[in-house]
Every structure is written in C-alpha cells, then in structure tokens.
Amino acid sequence: MEGSSKGLRKGAWTAEEDSLLRQCIGKYGEGKWHQVPLRAGLNRCRKSCRLRWLNYLKPSIKRGKFSSDEVDLLLRLHKLLGNRWSLIAGRLPGRTANDVKNYWNTHLSKKHEPCCKTKIKRINIITPPNTPAQKVDIF
C-alpha cells in the first residue's frame, strides 16, 4: 500500500527531480502514474509525481500574471459555477485549477465575495393567537 511506504521523499522538489520527471514523461507519455516513480528513478509517490507534472512542469501551463480578459472570465465563471476550480480552469486555457483557485483566493475573493452570495435572513412572522409561528426566508 502506497500510504504505508517508508522512505519516500516529501517536500520541495529539486531541479534534478524535475528533470528526471520531464525525461520520463517525454519518453513514456502521461498516464500510468503508478509506473512513473520507478521508471524515472524517483523516490516519490505516484500522486506527488502526477501533481508536480500537472501543476508545475507541463509545458502547456501558462506562467505569469492573469490578463484582464482572464480575470473577467474568471469572475463570470465563478459567479456561474462557484468554487468549482477544475471546471473554471478548463475554460481558461493554460491555467491549472490550482492556479485559478490561488488567484481567486489571493486577489479576488474579498473584493467579489459579497456580490456573489445571497444573504438569507430568517424572521418570525407575527401570527394570530392559537396558530403556530411561521419562519420565512427573506432574500
């Protein structure tokens, strides 16, 4: 079982590990992640290899600041989809779900959260005697 494996490296990746992973993916392609650590000669678990590739090393990943068009699209998609980062990232070419989530949390969440959530207030309606009180949601 992978979780009980001892001696697997954790923490920051080295440039050498990144290079080994790139070479392995270049030779064998993406997928079959359970074989990647052995093929690449890495002392990492398969999940760590997969996430490192998908979130940092994959050549199609965009680096740098989000453009104003990307920010605008992110705002509209978040209003529509909520915190479904994978779905949102799928509509922002070159951006990973992790990038999108981190950008939202560091740049946009505090500015745009109030407009995206409808506050519900519960109030008691005054009713005639001998009838149960009613609770109504007010938006």
UniProtKB/Swiss-Prot annotation:
Domain HTH myb-type, first and last residues per copy: 5-61, 62-112
One GO cellular component term noted in the UniProt record for this chain: nucleus
Matches recorded under InterPro entries: Homeodomain-like_sf (IPR009057), Myb_dom (IPR017930), Myb_TF_plants (IPR015495), SANT/Myb (IPR001005)
Single GO BP term: regulation of anthocyanin biosynthetic process
UniProt key word Transit peptide: no
Cell compartment(s), UniProt: Nucleus
Described purpose of this protein according to its UniProt entry: Transcription activator, when associated with BHLH002/EGL3/MYC146, BHLH012/MYC1, or BHLH042/TT8.
Assembly behavior: Interacts with BHLH002/EGL3/MYC146, BHLH012/MYC1 and BHLH042/TT8.
Annotated protein name in UniProt: Transcription factor MYB114
Organism, as annotated: Arabidopsis thaliana
